[in-house]
Amino acid sequence: MKQTILVTGGTGFIGSHTTVELQEAGYNVVIADNLSNSKIEVLDGIEKITGIRPAFEKVNLEDKEATERVFQKYPNIEGIIHFAASKAVGESVEKPLMYYRNNVVSLINLLEMMPKYNVKGFIFSSSCTVYGQPKPENLPVTEDAPHQKATSPYGNTKEINEQIIYDYIHSGAPIKSIVLRYFNPIGAHPTAHIGELPNGVPNNLIPYVTQTAMGIRKQLTIFGNDYNTEDGTCIRDYIYVVDLAKAHVAAMARVLDKETDKIEYFNIGTGSGNSTLEIVTTFEKATGVKVNWKFGPRREGDIEKIWGDCTKANTVLGWKADTPLEDVLASAWKWQQKLREDGVM
């Protein structure tokens, strides 16, 4: 019998790609999402790719009773992958209580349901933000690198939630967890049926690049060209969202295995960094489309450079991000063209 996995935030960017990979790996998927940052039409895209429409429940996970109804309706859930969260750094500074309520309360509600409904495995969507700006000698960062004080309430919710999961498991809760610390997910499914759907002006680099290339935005501003990097722009570890989704399938198989540790942590990235300027020039090379860009002043709170040591995920999960950057950026452009064709943007 197929194992059933609850994917919270499953109509979002990473959640939708992970749902596809889970279905293709033979799992049943139930999506719980309040659609605050995504669209119900994403389910159509998932179905076009896999031939299966996942079960869907519109629910606010900060509402404990509504959350419990999902578990009552689907009593065979064996594992949870928890993506659902508010995620805009700037907005979190303006509305910290909303972020703490949404991101922390929803986690607590899910964890409380697990023993009651015999759910064994929990994959948490964390972030490399917990590392802050690593010292140069600590690059690439490993899972045991020191954590820095978060620079935003959003980043702080990731740190707090990691601690809540740790404390709950160490209190003797009959569950297991894998915490995945992502770097920067980019790109879109090769079919262009699903991808990143920013609301309004994008917060992330790649949608801004593709929208500028399409003429939706007049100009891309690269924030800061005086950093201590080769070309003066920030460096990040950009990981293809499909590769990232496959890491969740590997993590779920592991967390449902009775023989593994109660809690484990994995960096999920490529293991190398690319500068902002490199991303723009590689996009132009991959697509043959010019991007109108300029340098601007540094943006407050931006980390200079970070990339992950992903050896542990490579060896323990048997997973590796190996899609070439040009292919990833071409997939993002194909998705942007599809959005234009469909009249979305």
What are these regions (language model features)?
Residues 94-97, 101, 105-112, 116, ...:
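Catalytic helix-loop patch of NAD(P)-dependent Rossmann-fold dehydrogenases
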Residues 28, 120-121, 176:
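Residues at the starts of beta-strands that form the adenosine-phosphate
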Residues 59, 206-345:
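C-terminal substrate-binding subdomain of Rossmann-fold SDR/epimerase-dehydratase oxidoreductases
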Residues 66, 109-113, 243-246:
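Conserved mid-core alpha-helix of short-chain dehydrogenase/reductase
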